[in-house]
Curated annotation (Swiss-Prot):
Enzyme Commission code(s) on record: 1.1.1.37
Protein name: Malate dehydrogenase
Entry coiled-coil feature ranges: none
Species for this entry: Sulfolobus acidocaldarius (strain ATCC 33909 / DSM 639 / JCM 8929 / NBRC 15157 / NCIMB 11770)
Swiss-Prot/TrEMBL GO biological process terms: lactate metabolic process; tricarboxylic acid cycle
Length: 306
């Protein structure tokens, strides 16, 4: 039996939860939000869809965090969303306070759960939650960027996206990078001779989210599908290789950073050895950059909550 809890059912949380539910592998899905009536009314919407889709999934909706109990997987989308003109990092203090509160409450009734962080800045929020809870925590990291990279190359070459392989690593955000030694087209190593410029791809991966937010008000459908794939790989122990952010020990902190890694009920091993030296060096630099920003933000956070 697989039980999945969603903490936060705003725009992104609803989309991920819907995709999870209609795929039918979760026996029970729990929906929590602080907004009165929001989980309940979302549950009604889902039930109306399930009646047509003939999917059998038990649903629980609540505004009481104590009702979230016995989950195998806890997906955290709760937090302030990114607005036009904002960096993901701008959300650190406000969302970190939410993560600390959740870290005190959720583990009590969800022993042994895998926590999947979605709230931004997603990698640092995973580190904050793990720091204050001690629980097994990953973030969805650069799985979404990975699909953006593949889809962009596929569109430029007029081929299906599933014929493009490879991963984006580093931080979900400013330090994201295409790991070019992993990228393939129709099973062969990527080459700019195909007519796709590397710098153009990197630029797209880093900037397209902000452009979507500017016009649509948020990114929804891409993350909704891409993040559900992470949940499914954990729930069904599929062992897919994905670019999610998992814990790395660096200096005096645990830092979450993305690189290709096997994802199932446990996360690992990482495929670091498959990267070329240039990609390894870029990842090392990304970890350092994220650590420095994280430490600076932690100091500010400690002043706010003390």
């Amino acid at each position: 039996m697989v039980k999945v809890a969603f903490i936060g059912v705003g725009r992104v949380g609803q989309t991920i939860a819907y995709n999870t539910i209609v795929n039918g592998y979760a026996d029970e899905v729990m929906l929590y939000d602080v907004v009165p009536e929001l989980p309940e009314k979302f549950e009604h919407e889902i039930r109306h869809a399930l009646a047509a889709l003939r999917v059998k999934t038990e649903l629980l909706s609540t505004n009481n965090i104590d009702d979230i109990s016995g989950a195998d997987i806890v997906v955290i989308t709760a937090g302030k969303p990114r607005k036009p003109g904002m960096s993901r990092r701008d959300l650190f203090i406000d969302n970190a306070k939410i993560m600390i509160d959740l870290a005190k409450k959720l583990p009590k009734k969800n022993k042994g759960a895998m926590y999947i962080m979605v709230a931004n800045p997603v990698d640092m929020m995973a580190s904050v939650f793990m720091k204050y809870s001690g629980e097994n925590t990953i973030s969805t990291g650069n799985q979404v960027e990975t699909m953006r990279m593949r889809s962009y190359i596929a569109k430029k070459l007029n081929i299906p996206a599933y014929e493009v392989g490879g991963y984006v690593g580093g931080e979900h955000g400013e330090a994201a990078m295409v790991l070019w030694s992993t990228v393939t087209v129709k099973g062969k190593p990527f080459s700019e001779s195909l007519g796709v410029n590397k710098a153009e791809v990197e630029d797209y991966v880093k900037k397209i989210a902000a452009e979507i937010i500017r016009v649509l008000g948020g990114t929804t459908w891409g993350p909704g599908a891409d993040i559900e794939e992470v949940i499914r790989s954990v729930a069904l122990n599929e062992g897919k290789v994905m670019s999610v952010a998992f814990p790395h020990k660096y200096e005096d902190e645990i830092i979450h950073i993305s690189e290709p890694v096997v994802v199932g009920r446990t996360v690992g091993p990482a495929l670091t050895s498959a990267l070329d030296e240039n990609d390894k060096a870029r990842l090392s630099q990304a970890i350092k950059e994220v650590y420095n920003v994280y430490k600076s933000n932690l100091k500010e956070l400690e002043q706010v909550i003390s």
